């Protein structure tokens, strides 16, 4: 009898642990981590000081705001997630979380994220967070994703807003500096997403999501990736020319951008297993991380040298 009770208790503990993990997965933690990082850099680049407690609340609100959008996205896309290999293990598809529970979780976390941002930080940051959640769910997920070949180009607005929210959380303004951070992510999104679509092309075909390689073909998509990579190279240098960073940033970001262009160009010589597309996809993640980290470090050096 004691062994049976122990077994039941262990099952309850394991179920509880898996549920917590599943709710974390529901919020798309990989995407959330990049959102938090770019938001935090936006906060650090703002030319104002903020109390660490307020800054912490802002970061938590943005994290849960992003998580709520991810949860509602999984709720809405549960039908096509079951058809794609890379999304078949998501919590709703596996039955770990019921669709209604996921929707409720997303709505509640989103509401409290926006509410506490308004209550503890400022109304501008709260409005931008609300707009970002709305845009990702309604404009991208519901309207564009299954209808337009430009889904991630237009839909990328929501993914590019976190540093603007972070900047606004500290300064209560939107400036040229935060707009440039926005543009870097906005232009980075198409080559990043289309590289993924190149090696997941069959998945997108199966679920009938009109990604660029699926509708226009791989060659056309590769040309578009190269164009956007060139635009990204130009935009990534802008922080130097508006006095947001120093010469070190110009040199290193230029090198990182040239490597990005190299990987984009190598797509035209890709193998059937899409090896180069996978390399570009992975590199693009590291690229964005290092560009934002470099911006923060060189901006800090510039600020110290001007004192």
Swiss-Prot record:
Its membrane topology: Multi-pass membrane protein
Catalysed conversion reaction: heme b + (2E,6E)-farnesyl diphosphate + H2O = Fe(II)-heme o + diphosphate
Transmembrane segments: 31-51, 52-72, 102-119, 123-145, 151-171, 179-199, 225-245, 247-267, 281-301
GO molecular function: protoheme IX farnesyltransferase activity
Record keywords, A-Z: Cell inner membrane, Cell membrane, Heme biosynthesis, Membrane, Transferase, Transmembrane, Transmembrane helix
GO annotation terms (biological process): heme O biosynthetic process
Any Pfam family: UbiA
CDD domains with a match to the protein in the record: PT_UbiA_Cox10
One GO term describing the cellular component: plasma membrane
EC number of this enzyme: 2.5.1.141
Subcellular localization: Cell inner membrane
Biochemical pathway: Porphyrin-containing compound metabolism; heme O biosynthesis; heme O from protoheme: step 1/1
Keyword flag Isomerase: no
Coiled coil: none
Entries under InterPro entries matching the protein: Protohaem_IX_farnesylTrfase (IPR006369), UbiA_prenyltransferase (IPR000537), UbiA_prenylTrfase_CS (IPR030470), UbiA_sf (IPR044878)
Similarity annotation: Belongs to the UbiA prenyltransferase family. Protoheme IX farnesyltransferase subfamily.
Function of the molecule: Converts heme B (protoheme IX) to heme O by substitution of the vinyl group on carbon 2 of heme B porphyrin ring with a hydroxyethyl farnesyl side group.
Additional detail: Carbon 2 of the heme B porphyrin ring is defined according to the Fischer nomenclature.
Entry-linked NCBIfam families: cyoE_ctaB, PRK04375.1-2
Protein name per Swiss-Prot or TrEMBL: Protoheme IX farnesyltransferase
Source species: Rickettsia canadensis (strain McKiel)
């Amino acid at each position: 009898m004691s062994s049976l009770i122990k077994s039941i208790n262990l099952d309850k503990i394991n179920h509880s642990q898996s549920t917590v993990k599943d709710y974390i997965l529901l919020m798309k933690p990989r995407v959330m981590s990049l959102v938090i990082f770019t938001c935090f850099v936006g906060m650090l680049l703002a030319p104002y000081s903020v109390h660490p407690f307020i800054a912490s609340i802002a970061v938590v609100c943005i994290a849960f705001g992003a998580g709520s959008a991810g949860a509602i996205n999984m709720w809405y896309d549960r039908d096509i997630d079951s058809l794609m290999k890379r999304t078949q293990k998501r919590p709703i598809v596996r039955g770990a979380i019921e669709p209604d529970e996921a929707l409720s979780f997303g709505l509640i976390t989103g509401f409290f994220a926006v509410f506490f941002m308004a209550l503890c930080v400022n109304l501008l940051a709260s409005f931008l967070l609300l707009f970002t959640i709305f845009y990702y769910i309604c404009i991208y997920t519901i309207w564009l994703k299954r209808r337009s070949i430009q889904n991630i180009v237009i839909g990328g607005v929501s993914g590019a807003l976190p540093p603007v929210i972070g900047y606004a959380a500290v300064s209560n303004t939107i400036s040229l500096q935060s707009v440039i951070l926005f543009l870097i992510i906005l232009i980075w999104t198409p080559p990043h997403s289309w590289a993924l679509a190149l090696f997941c092309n069959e998945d997108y075909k199966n679920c009938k999501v009109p990604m660029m390689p699926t509708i226009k073909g791989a060659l056309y998509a590769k040309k578009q990736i190269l164009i956007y990579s060139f635009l990204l190279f130009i935009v990534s240098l802008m922080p130097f020319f508006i006095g947001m960073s120093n010469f070190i940033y110009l040199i290193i970001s230029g090198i990182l951008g040239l490597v990005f262009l190299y990987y984009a160009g190598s797509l035209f010589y890709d193998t059937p297993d899409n090896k180069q597309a996978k390399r570009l996809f992975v590199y693009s993640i590291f690229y964005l991380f290092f560009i934002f980290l470099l911006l923060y470090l060189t901006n800090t050096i510039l600020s110290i040298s001007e004192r």
